Design a protein with these regions (language model features):
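Extracytoplasmic "Venus flytrap"
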Residues: 31-54, 79-84, 107, 181-190, ...
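Solvent-exposed, acidic/polar segments of extracytosolic/periplasmic ligand-binding ectodomains
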Residues: 352, 356-419
Length: 419
């Protein structure tokens, strides 16, 4: 269905080998190691739907073409419970099942643990290597100071997202005071630091009214935080919160009648528009690699195909980069003629993928995908630019800034060791 261009492209004692040799027709398996239970289970379920959609698209097109013939892809779901420690347990389980490809993204802390483990374990076991594909963990260090040959990121990192948001904040002349509220882990701290830097460079007249972190996944009532924001006099909030930490935050803002804009990384996702309702119209700004109202016949066709496959309103959260990651992984396997993780990692380097509406390239230097970004504003469905709503809420997003792929790259500090 999709097309690609320029396809120039025993973990420790007692651990079993992850084999890359396949019998003809045997599935090539990808292990999704993600929090499928706990406070972010809804985010894990959304990831599974998107990856499964990508797997089904690849298989409908004939699967992965290796030297010995065509093979279907298979998604194997392993529950990390959102914990780095449990993620490493599931990494071992994937190895014991001879799975050479691992997907994860909902936590930069988990991603960092997986990268560190794979760096060591792949070095010790050159015949049982595993490759990590990352769809959402946005800590810039993962393709910077802590980059790895065994890791490729298919999402824009936090710095790239913040740069796009800053373009919109820079022209918001009503902006005077900003409150930074983020989850207390590496990604949340990155968002805070990047927001401070962006505002200092682009809007030095804007005051930081507060800079606060909260425990991730543990706050059930954000009312005290909303009270602090109100007391600070801030007219905008910048947050990288995601999952229930975002939904509960915006719900508290609506209930307390907070009259402030929200500049978010994920304000278009997982219940946030419904939680805000009319209170979010014109006040919630989000940034993403794609959204249903991006426009164009092929973009619309992708969205409608996803909704046909997952028609329930609560499942209406298509994330193009996630299904595209699976399609690019399959393209790299076909290019290499092999499901060997080393060959596939090399084939991914420099791989350009064009589906007709979201052309992207995997930068070889640091394994960071370069793709377009969209900054969007919440409004009622049916208003100009908002043909599709989110999750049956009656609210959707219109593009206020489209950043072409060639404008999104940022310098990298990656110094990669290659096998």
């Amino acid at each position: 269905m999709q097309q690609w261009k320029r396809c120039a492209v025993a973990l420790s004692a007692g651990w079993m080998l992850a084999s890359s040799a396949f019998a003809a027709g045997e599935p090539v398996r990808v292990a999704l190691i993600e929090g499928m239970s706990g406070p972010f289970a809804n985010a894990g379920a959304a990831v599974e739907r998107n990856l499964r959609f990508g797997v089904e698209q690849v298989n409908a097109a004939g699967g992965v073409k290796l030297r010995d013939g065509a093979h279907p892809l298979e998604l194997v779901v392993l529950d990390s419970k959102g914990s780095p420690e449990e993620a490493l347990v599931q990494l071992r389980a994937a190895a014991e099942r001879h799975i050479g490809f691992v997907a994860q993204g909902n936590s930069s802390a988990v991603a960092a643990a997986l990268v560190a483990a794979l760096d060591k374990l792949n070095a010790r076991n050159p015949d049982s290597r595993m490759l990590f594909v990352n769809y959402s963990a946005d800590d810039p260090a993962l393709t910077g100071a802590r980059c790895s040959f065994w890791h490729s990121r298919f999402d824009a990192h936090a710095g790239m997202r913040m740069a796009a948001l800053a373009d919109v904040m820079a022209r918001d002349r009503a902006l005077r005071k900003v409150y930074l509220l983020n989850q207390d882990y590496s990604f949340g701290h990155d968002v805070s630091t990047l927001a401070r830097q962006a505002l200092a460079e682009r809007r030095p007249d804007v005051t930081i009214a507060g800079d606060e972190f909260h425990p991730i996944g543990r706050i059930k009532d954000f009312s005290p935080y909303i009270a602090k924001i109100r007391a600070s006099g801030a007219d905008a909030v910048v947050t990288g919160n995601w999952g229930n930490d975002l939904t509960l935050l915006v719900k508290a803002a609506r209930e307390q009648g907070l009259n402030a804009k929200f500049y978010t990384f994920y304000g278009n996702s997982l219940g946030a528009p419904a939680a805000l309702g009319d209170a979010g119209v014109g006040r919630v700004i989000a940034v993403a690699d794609w959204h249903p109202n991006a426009g164009g016949a092929k973009s619309d066709a992708f969205y409608r195909a996803f909704r046909t496959r997952f028609p329930a309103a609560q499942d209406d959260y298509p994330v193009r980069r996630m299904s595209m990651m699976i399609e690019m992984l399959a393209a790299a396997m076909t290019r290499a003629g092999s499901a060997d993780p080393v060959a596939v990692a090399r084939a991914l380097e420099g791989l350009s993928f064009d589906d007709g509406f979201h052309a992207s390239t995997m930068r070889a230097q640091d394994h960071q995908l370069i793709q377009p970004l969209y900054v969007m504003e919440m409004d009622k469905a049916g208003t100009p630019g908002v043909r599709f709503d989110n999750e049956g809420s009656g609210y959707g997003f219109r593009t206020v800034l489209a950043v072409p792929a060639q404008r999104t790259p940022m310098p990298s500090t990656c110094s990669m060791t290659r096998p």
